[in-house]
Amino acid sequence: MSGHSKWSTIKRKKAATDQKRGNLFTKLVREITIAAKMGGGDPSGNPRLRLALDNARANSMPQENIQRAIKKGTGELDGVVYEEITYEGYGPGGIALIIETATDNRNRTVADIRHIINRSNGSLGENGSVSWMFHRKGCIDVLKSSAGEEELMEILLEAGLEDLNTDDEQFYNVIIDVKDLESAKKALDDKGIAYENARMDMIPDNYVELEAEDAVKAVKLIDALENSDDVQVVYSNIEFSEQAMNSLDS
């Protein structure tokens, strides 16, 4: 899982900038709205909404914004109707891309995504062209300062831990079955262990290692996609060589 850990590290470094752009709140609002639309506005019976609300609060979203997003999803307030569409394709160095969107205009969205990918000499593929390379998993970034590795493993093994990556300097990257994500969060909460960004990710079965030039191009491509208004999240099977990591850090 080292490739996933390295990419998670890079994405965390981008997070502060993304929040300044306002992108983060926009994505969170759309996720809350869609979750409420699909499963109702009561988080106790809607796990997806519960997770979206946890992430919104962790990022200091005002309660007023949260409630308005829920009510738009349930139809209690008028608002834009979003549909979820997933696109698949390839980027620099042959990396696979899964692009999840929430849009009110699919023609605009696919045109924007195709333009961004083509600009990087990538290509947009058919549905299923790369998704077979990935599996959806629950992921939690646990602060290393809040628990030792052995303690964390002991706590999470009972909650269904599948993998624990320790490569990052600040965080353990926990991989768990989606159905066990909430029980893992509860186990951490019960022990007072601090974590960030509990989420569902698409984890690749295998990684494509990129050298410096392609790595820089790939990160710029993913950054451009994630800054597109309709894109919620981008998954890839990037692995970075040591030289590439140094180039990205510089």
Curated annotation (Swiss-Prot):
Gene3D superfamilies named in the record: 1.10.10.200, 3.30.70.980
Subcellular localization(s) per the UniProt record: Cytoplasm
One Gene Ontology term from the biological process aspect of the record: regulation of DNA-templated transcription
Matching SUPFAM superfamilies: YebC-like
Record-linked Pfam families: TACO1_YebC_N, Transcrip_reg
Domain of life: Bacteria
MF (Gene Ontology): DNA binding
InterPro entries from the UniProt entry: Integrase-like_N (IPR017856), TACO1_YebC-like_2nd/3rd_dom (IPR048300), TACO1_YebC_N (IPR049083), Transcrip_reg_TACO1-like (IPR002876), Transcrip_reg_TACO1-like_dom3 (IPR026564), YebC-like (IPR029072)
Cellular component GO terms, alphabetical: cytosol
Keywords: Cytoplasm, DNA-binding, Transcription, Transcription regulation
Family recorded in the similarity comment: Belongs to the TACO1 family.
Name of the protein in question: Probable transcriptional regulatory protein Paes_0496
Naturally occurring in which organism (per UniProt): Prosthecochloris aestuarii (strain DSM 271 / SK 413)
